[in-house]
Amino acid sequence: MAKPKKKVTRIRRRERKNIERGHAHIQSTFNNTIITLTDVHGNAISWASSGQLGFKGSRKSTPFASQMAAETAAKAAMEHGLKSVEVFVKGPGSGREAAIRALQATGLEVTMIKDVTPIPHNGCRPPKRRRV
C-alpha cells in the first residue's frame, strides 16, 4: 500500500509595513475586549482580544485581560514600525482605561483619546435589569 505524500507547507512571513502613525480601536463590551490597531486609512495592522489570549468566561471582561490584549496587539504592531496612535474607545466595558494604559506602557505614544460609543436616540429596548 502506498504511503500518502506529506504536504510541505511553508509559513509565509508577512512583509514589514513601515507605518509610524495609526489608530487604536478599543471595543470593550460587558463580555470581552477587542483591540485593533490600524493605519490612518483603517487597514488593520494587528489585533488581539481577551478571548484570543485564552481567557474564558467572566475572566474575559476583566481589566487585566484587556491589558494583556492591548500589550499583545501593540507589540505586534510595533514590529511594523508603529510609533504613535490615536485611540478610539467604544463600549461600556471595564477594560477601557486598562487597555489605554497598556498601550502607553508598551511604548506607543497616545496622541488623542476619543469616545465613539454609539448612543441611541431611543432606539432598541435595553435588556431587563439584573436581580442578584
UniProtKB/Swiss-Prot annotation:
GO terms for cellular component: ribonucleoprotein complex; ribosome. The keyword rRNA-binding applies. GO terms for molecular function: rRNA binding; structural constituent of ribosome. PROSITE patterns: RIBOSOMAL_S11. The keyword rRNA-binding applies. One of its GO terms (biological process) is translation. InterPro entries: Ribosomal_uS11, Ribosomal_uS11_bac-type, Ribosomal_uS11_CS, Ribosomal_uS11_sf. Part of the 30S ribosomal subunit. Interacts with proteins S7 and S18. Binds to IF-3. NCBIfam families: PRK05309.1, uS11_bact. Located on the platform of the 30S subunit, it bridges several disparate RNA helices of the 16S rRNA. Forms part of the Shine-Dalgarno cleft in the 70S ribosome. This is Small ribosomal subunit protein uS11. It comes from Clostridioides difficile (strain 630). The lineage of its organism: Bacteria, Bacillati, Bacillota, Clostridia, Peptostreptococcales.
